[in-house]
Amino acid sequence: MEGGRCAQVSSVPASPSSGHRHRAALILARGGSKGIPLKNIKNLAGVPLIGWVLRAALDSDVDSVWVSTDHDEIERVAKLWGAKVHRRSPEVSKDSSSSLETIQEFIRLRPEVDVICHIQATSPCLHPHHINEALQKITHQGFSYVLSVVRRHQFRWEELQENEDRNPKSFNINVAQRPRRQDWPGELYENGSFYFSTRKAWESGLTELGRIAYYEMPPEFSVDIDVDIDWPVAEQRVLRFGYFGREENAAVRLFLCKVSGCLTNGQIYMSVSGEDLVTINARDVAGIQMLQKENIEVILISSVNEPLSRGVLEKVSQRAGCGLSFTEQRNALEMQKLMDKRKLHWDQVAFMGSESEDVEIMSQAGLNGVPSDAPVAELIAAKYTCQRAGGHGAVREFAEYILSMKRKSSREENHERIDKHNF
């Protein structure tokens, strides 16, 4: 089984219900996080933390995806990523409120829901197949409760109080016969990615669970974020093992970049002689060159609606060392003409935009990105949101992201080519 293993851990009689059962994914995202303020919508590798699990849930076999929150900004981000929002009541929005209380409120208001897939927002390496395989334990095999676990090889010891004068006891190791890692299967621990259960189990307060199963996830997908120190580790892990959607981005052959607001900071300076002046960042130029070295063509795009004159735009493209497309309108139809000349498809195009009129192209491109200060970020869930602003290294940052996705896909292709039977 890809990515995980399922197992039964209890045998109370139960059987799958006949007919379709509404399966709802539910992510709890309260605004009052104590460890990292508003961590659920803080960007992790260019995507809001909650966006990683929403992307996986939306591409899975569940019937609906919900975010339960008490915060306006979390609600906005959740809707932007395609989720429905359950606005929780003040009674279940307190620091002392439990997840169980919040889920019970949700199912009281949603009588159509039969199976609740409680997914943790802090598990950014979750993939749709993890959700689907665990969900089948309930929908096809008659289990009532499924939790995600990870296998760890850790020896546990008893904790003593300071005033206790005795030796601590070992829980799972004989000190005189310490096994090698490869000789010990390890133990299963909850990894906190998800808890799936039938409506009846949640309504009972999890006191009547019926048949229980666990779903084992490999360690590389078992990432949890609780405090600041977890963030950089999770960022590196998600770039390699996170779920980036159904599209294949390794085939990017054309990068289209808007000039004003992306390559420049959107400001226009005027010389004493009345000439328009703009600045471009040397790091962005280096990023363009990085893509070109990987045989990715770079074209700056602009239109008659841009505040910059065509002469200035041509100088910018010359300095950046790439092509320029100057059109009557900046829309998907004009970009399609560029692609047709090169016999390319949208999934082979990466696009960087910044304004509301860029939404159409962003929604078509196989890979899209925005600077940190882009107004369009309020309108569409970008696949990558830069930490840097337009004209301040955002193009370089997005270029590095494009290349990292290409390397990631190459690793996966090489892994698939390995003959595991003769390895």
UniProtKB/Swiss-Prot annotation:
Signal peptide extent: none
Catalytic activity: an N-acylneuraminate + CTP = a CMP-N-acyl-beta-neuraminate + diphosphate
Entry-linked InterPro entries: CMP-NeuNAc_synthase, Cytidylyl_trans, HAD-like_sf, HAD_sf, Nucleotide-diphossugar_trans
Enzymatic class: transferase
Keyword terms of this UniProt record: Cytoplasm, Nucleotidyltransferase, Transferase
Pathway field: Amino-sugar metabolism; N-acetylneuraminate metabolism
Gene3D superfamilies noted in UniProt: HAD superfamily/HAD-like, Spore Coat Polysaccharide Biosynthesis Protein SpsA, Chain A
E.C. number(s) listed in UniProt: 2.7.7.43
Active site per the UniProt annotation: R178
PANTHER family: HAD SUPERFAMILY MEMBERS CMAS AND KDSC, N-ACYLNEURAMINATE CYTIDYLYLTRANSFERASE
Primary role: Catalyzes the activation of 2-keto-3-deoxy-D-glycero-D-galacto-nononic acid (KDN) to cytidine 5'-monophosphate 2-keto-3-deoxy-D-glycero-D-galacto-nononic acid (CMP-KDN), a substrate required for the addition of sialic acid. Also has weak activity towards N-acetylneuraminic acid (NeuNAc) and N-glycolylneuraminic acid (Neu5Gc).
Full protein name: N-acylneuraminate cytidylyltransferase B
Gene behind the chain: cmasb
